[in-house]
């Protein structure tokens, strides 16, 4: 079994990615378990931030690293909150505070203009000096609901409505979510590439 460090401090992402990766026989260790501090996210895109995080974890641990950078892009807000999704309402904002700020920003936006996409970029870095890290992008289209619904998931899941399923992301089972989510898509692309390598 190959040990890989997961370069994130977000407990929701750790749970979700560790569960998915364990299904494929990968020994995933969260960077927090190895005493690795979070990398500073100074990039302007999901790709830049994911590469920064993966390289930092690989340099600190000497292990291959997987990093995720993801967020919500809302059409009516010009793609915001985007790379600032986790800190939309402030640096130490809770999921609930971020969600409330987003709903307030969309208060007068009609249903047909509430389109949004979750984006996930996964980076697999074989070692800290890897000149060609593997980069995978998953995108999940939906609509921002007017009110939260559901208790599963994390972040914006309670207001991310998936018309094709008739539910918010927070109303989906783990299996349903992984089959269609941005993170599930990016992970499938990554695992397919690793199998073929």
From Swiss-Prot:
Free-text comment on the cofactor: Binds 1 Mg(2+) ion per subunit.
Enzyme type, top EC level: hydrolase
Keywords tagged on the record: Hydrolase, Magnesium, Metal-binding, Nucleotide metabolism, Nucleotide-binding
Protein name as catalogued: dITP/XTP pyrophosphatase
Function of the protein: Pyrophosphatase that catalyzes the hydrolysis of nucleoside triphosphates to their monophosphate derivatives, with a high preference for the non-canonical purine nucleotides XTP (xanthosine triphosphate), dITP (deoxyinosine triphosphate) and ITP. Seems to function as a house-cleaning enzyme that removes non-canonical purine nucleotides from the nucleotide pool, thus preventing their incorporation into DNA/RNA and avoiding chromosomal lesions.
Annotated substrate binding sites: 8-13, 70, 154-157, 177, 182-183
Family annotation (Pfam families): Ham1p_like (PF01725)
Active site per UniProt: 69
This protein's record includes keyword Nucleotide-binding: yes
Cofactor(s) demanded: Mg(2+)
Subunit structure comment from the entry: Homodimer.
EC numbers for this chain: 3.6.1.66
Catalytic reaction list: XTP + H2O = XMP + diphosphate + H(+); dITP + H2O = dIMP + diphosphate + H(+); ITP + H2O = IMP + diphosphate + H(+)
Binding site for Mg(2+): 40, 69
